[in-house]
Every structure is written in C-alpha cells, then in structure tokens.
Amino acid sequence: MHLLIAAAGSGRRMGADRNKLLLPLLGRPLIAWTVDAALTATEISWIGIVGQDIDRAEILDALGSVKKPLVWIQGGATRQESVLRGLAGLPEGARHVLIHDGARCLVQPDLFDRCAVAVEAGAALIAATPVTDTIKRVDEHGMIRDTPDRAELWAAQTPQGFEVEQLRQGHVRAQAEGWSVTDDASLFERLGWSVQVLDAGPSNIKVTTPFDLTVAEAVLSSRTTP
C-alpha cells in the first residue's frame, strides 16, 4: 500500500513560528512518530511526504535513514492541491493510496494495516471515531437550532483510503468546479461516491494545540514505559 503523509502543518495554533510537525515530542520531532508507525505497519510499502520546500531538509534529516522507500513531494498552496500533487508523485502503477495527516502522530501501525487491507478489498474509507459528546447545531447568533442523533455521528480522521484513479478524477473535478473541501471523503460525498468508516479507537488525535501536544506526550510515554 502507498501512503501519502500531509506534512505542511502550520504552527499558528500551537503558538509556534515553525511547522508544528517539527516541534519536539519526547525528544523527537512530532512527524518522526507518525512515520515510525508507517514504517512498522506491514501493509505499507511506500511513503510519500507531501510538504513545503522550506521544511524539506529539516524533516528529512529528522527521519534519517529508513528501511522503506520514502520520497519527498512538493506540496501546493492548499491541502487539495497538495493531495493532487501527491497523487502525481505516486509510483507508476499505484492502484490504491492512504492519505494521513502528519499531525496524527499517535496513529498505530495496526490502523494503517486495517485501512490498507480494507481499501485493497475495494472500499473507500476513512478512519473515524464515534462522537461521544452531544452535538448541538447552532445559528449565526449562537442559538441552538437542533440536536443531531449522536448515534449517527462520527468524527472524521485519517488515514483515508481510496482507489488512486478515482481520487485523482475527483480532485480534477473539484479543481475545475472551484470546490473547496476539508478532506477527501467530503469530495467523494459531493460526487455521490460511497465512503465507509473504520473505527480508529480513541487515541488517534490530531495535534493542533499545546493541550493536544501534552496529551500526545502522555499517551506516547504510556506506550513506551515497560
């Protein structure tokens, strides 16, 4: 399975002036933990890091020598453009792809493997977790409009997996139509294509704020403590 890791993370909400994926996490850059999980996953055979040129040297230096094919792909101005460039950078003949946020550094190798197996069996899917809070839909004034049924709500995460050519066609269509979506599954929804969820468990968080970084440190410490 081919894996694209989105690595153009901003440090703005972390209060940092650099890519948050380069922030230290238990003595290593955050992205190193993400890549470690991909390297350990038995179903992942190729890794593409999609990022900005300003971060290239530092990210690749942080990863060091790895035992799987790993390439750098220059990202675009938006996530959508970066994914399209990532697809263009896949090896010739690649049929399926997983796309993962570099900031989800708590991902477990098993999650990559489960997603890969399901995608290769024909599914378009996203890792997700059932929503446990009661969700309120509000209007522009902050007044509650209604309460969606929590049993139907899942929080979308990554990896997200698709057939390469179908995903490429979707992004080309989005580019032509001027659509803006927050993830690849939203693009499939807009085109009427089916996507299923795969339960990622509770710990597959995206590190976005300083609090998230504290949580990630605690989780990783618990995993590495004998």
Curated annotation (Swiss-Prot):
Top-tier EC class: transferase
Protein name in the entry: 2-C-methyl-D-erythritol 4-phosphate cytidylyltransferase
Species annotation: Synechococcus sp. (strain CC9902)
Keywords per UniProt: Isoprene biosynthesis, Nucleotidyltransferase, Transferase
HAMAP family: IspD (MF_00108)
Gene: ispD
Function: Catalyzes the formation of 4-diphosphocytidyl-2-C-methyl-D-erythritol from CTP and 2-C-methyl-D-erythritol 4-phosphate (MEP).
Family affiliation: Belongs to the IspD/TarI cytidylyltransferase family. IspD subfamily.
GO BP of this protein: isopentenyl diphosphate biosynthetic process, methylerythritol 4-phosphate pathway
NCBIfam families per the UniProt record, alphabetical: ispD
